[in-house]
């Protein structure tokens, strides 16, 4: 797997200060995509053990609230295979330790053009490692960017069809109801100041 870019101290792609990994490769090709330079699977540089280690080191800073994975398309089958071991390393190094407000100490966000349904068994991008990967992710921003639905007031997403899914709450709801994650979606709740005011 290649990566197109790593942004340290990123505040645009998830809550708080984060390290954001932009993987290379996307077959979707959404018109108006903000990162079309990462569509090629050959773009950027190889995602090596040394790069993994540097990202994990960056997450160790107390001011860093977590990792964001975007692209490109993280859920392309090749990229899932390239990411799963790394994401499991991150989750093992930074387990879901709960803060007094109930949030995990370090969160993992993932932006994908797939809907959650497409990542379920029999879905377009379901692979042998999809469940392992989703099991490490806290917030999944799902759905393709649709230029006609672009809305500058939206936080952490570009078009109104995209959802910010709280996968931890969704997993709990799915277990309680005995159904798939896609049928038990719980949306992430933004802070009230952002939820009620345009950006």
What residue ranges belong to the model's regions?
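Conserved Radical SAM active-site core
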Residues: 1-4, 17, 32-124
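Ubiquitous "structural anchor" signal
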Residues: 22, 79-80, 151, 166
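Hydrophobic pocket-lining residues within nucleotide cofactor-binding pockets
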Residues: 26, 74, 145
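Alpha-helix termini
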Residues: 27-29, 38, 84-85, 151, ...
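Basic, gly/Ser/Thr/Pro-rich low-complexity segments located predominantly at protein N termini
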Residues: 30, 76-77, 148, 163
């Amino acid at each position: 797997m290649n990566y197109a870019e790593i942004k340290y101290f990123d505040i645009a792609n998830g809550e708080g200060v984060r390290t954001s990994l932009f993987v290379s490769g996307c077959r979707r090709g959404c018109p108006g995509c903000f990162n079309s330079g990462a569509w090629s699977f050959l773009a950027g540089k190889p995602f090596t053990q040394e790069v993994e280690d540097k990202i994990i080191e960056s997450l160790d800073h107390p001011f860093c609230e977590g990792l964001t994975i975007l692209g490109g398309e993280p859920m392309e089958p090749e990229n899932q295979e390239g990411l799963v071991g790394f994401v499991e390393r991150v989750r093992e190094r930074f387990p879901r330790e709960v803060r007094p407000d109930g949030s995990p100490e370090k969160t993992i966000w993932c932006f994908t053009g797939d809907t959650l349904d497409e990542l379920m068994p029999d879905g377009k991008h379901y692979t042998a490692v999809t469940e392992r990967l989703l099991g490490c992710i806290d917030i999944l921003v799902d759905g393709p960017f649709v230029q006609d639905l672009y809305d500058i007031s939206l936080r952490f997403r570009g078009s109104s069809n995209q959802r910010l899914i709280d996968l931890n709450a969704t997993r709990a709801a799915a277990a309680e109801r005995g159904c798939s994650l896609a049928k038990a979606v719980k949306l992430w709740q933004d802070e009230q100041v952002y939820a009620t005011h345009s950006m």
